[in-house]
């Protein structure tokens, strides 16, 4: 077997008692990745929104849920429900032919990305892994990422800590049940990437759609930046600057001002990458590059004050290439027409 092009995490070398590669029931992300050429390439995937399928969906990926035969896919969007409240009964309709199958779309994005002529050294999933909280959904996803043979790290989004109860009811009559995030989702976790450092922060709030970093995370962040001798990139879910869409900006990071005050004294922070907004953007603020990334499923139309799906934007993912000289290159790739 040919040697891997980069150092691998303990997750890759962990062997069970029977001599077989152990499945990541409690996977251990790496604390450090090094490459011979000094470049670390990160594949960012976000907003997968996996959930247990309904009989109407056509993608069939079998797993067990409470000993019942189930399938995994994603949210099914109705063409007639592309405007209005994203949580309305019309906007999420399981009785129509699905337009987007989120599991199939995620799988197509992952397969396409790993077939590109780009060496992938780390996969980062920035939240909203699921749309309904079940351990089996996470386990299925972790096993799929594990099968890639590439180190991976996942953080929580709002859907990973909040279950929406009464989806058949009007939005204002529904309740939001808080949950603790899956134990394998990272928070206040750092990883050395050659001459870079990536910090993983949980911005999700159980029972809420908006984000909040919180005092503990901000203090941890200030300590990491104060003691870092490397350029730093942060991975989190919620956006830190308005997207100029009223409906999504109602669910921004609530303590974004405190975040910017916390990082202002430090020059180490170079970039923040996240999801939540289901669209691609690149901006700069206080000398920091901010990247939002398309969902691997459905997209939101930019610049709309009311919830609007983007008919023309395809699912996608982001590459981040961290160079040994402290520079960063990043680009978005969309799913090809013949993929998935």
UniProtKB/Swiss-Prot annotation:
Regarding protein family, the annotation reads: Belongs to the cyclic nucleotide phosphodiesterase class-III family.
Q: Which domain of life is it from?
A: Bacteria
Q: What is this protein called?
A: Probable cyclic nucleotide phosphodiesterase PsycPRwf_0181
Identify the keywords attached in UniProt to this record, alphabetized. Answer: Hydrolase, Iron, Metal-binding, Nucleotide-binding
Q: What is its EC number?
A: 3.1.4.-
UniProt: AMP binding residues: 49, 128, 158-159, 278
Family annotation (PANTHER family):
CYCLIC NUCLEOTIDE PHOSPHODIESTERASE CBUA0032-RELATED, PHOSPHOHYDROLASE
**Record-listed Fe cation 1 binding positions:** 47, 49, 128, 278
Q: Residues annotated as region Disordered?
A: 1-36
- Which InterPro entries does the UniProt record give? Calcineurin-like_PHP_ApaH, CNP_phosphodiesterase-III, Metallo-depent_PP-like
Binding, Fe cation 2: 128, 158, 237, 276
Q: Which cofactor does it need?
A: Fe(2+)
Q: What class of enzyme is it?
A: hydrolase
| Entry's Gene Ontology molecular function annotations | 3',5'-cyclic-AMP phosphodiesterase activity; metal ion binding; nucleotide binding
Note accompanying the cofactor annotation: Binds 2 Fe(2+) ions per subunit.
Q: List, alphabetically, the Pfam families matched.
A: Metallophos
């Amino acid at each position: 077997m040919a040697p891997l092009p980069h150092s691998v995490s303990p997750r890759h070398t962990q062997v069970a008692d029977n001599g077989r590669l152990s499945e990541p029931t409690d996977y251990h992300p790496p604390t450090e990745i090094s490459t011979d050429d000094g470049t670390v390439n990160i594949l960012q995937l976000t907003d997968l929104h996996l959930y247990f399928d309904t009989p109407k969906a056509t993608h069939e990926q079998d797993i067990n849920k409470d000993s019942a035969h189930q399938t995994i896919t994603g949210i099914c969007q109705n063409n007639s429900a592309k405007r209005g409240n994203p949580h309305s009964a019309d906007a999420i309709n399981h009785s129509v032919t699905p337009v987007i199958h989120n599991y199939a779309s995620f799988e197509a994005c992952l397969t396409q990305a790993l077939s590109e002529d780009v060496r992938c050294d780390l996969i980062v999933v920035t939240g909203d892994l699921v749309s309904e909280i079940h351990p089996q959904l996470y386990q299925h996803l972790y096993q799929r990422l594990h099968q890639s043979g590439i180190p991976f790290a996942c953080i929580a989004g709002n859907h990973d800590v909040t279950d929406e109860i009464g989806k058949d009811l009007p939005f204002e009559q529904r309740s939001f049940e808080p949950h603790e995030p899956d134990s394998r989702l990272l928070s206040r976790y750092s990883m050395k990437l050659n001459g870079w450092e990536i910090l993983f922060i949980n911005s999700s709030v159980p029972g809420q759609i908006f984000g909040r970093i919180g005092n503990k995370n901000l203090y941890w962040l200030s300590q990491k930046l104060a003691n870092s001798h490397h350029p730093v990139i942060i991975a989190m879910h919620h956006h830190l600057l308005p997207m100029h869409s009223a409906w999504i900006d109602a669910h921004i990071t609530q303590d974004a001002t405190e975040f910017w005050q916390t990082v202002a004294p430090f020059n180490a922070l170079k970039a923040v990458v996240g999801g939540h907004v289901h669209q691609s953007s690149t901006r700069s603020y206080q000398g920091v590059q901010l990247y939002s990334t398309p969902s691997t499923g459905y997209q939101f139309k930019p610049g709309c004050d009311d919830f609007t799906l983007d008919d023309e934007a395809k699912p996608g993912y982001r590459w981040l290439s961290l160079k040994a000289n402290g520079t960063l290159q990043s680009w978005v790739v969309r799913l090809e027409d013949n993929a998935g």
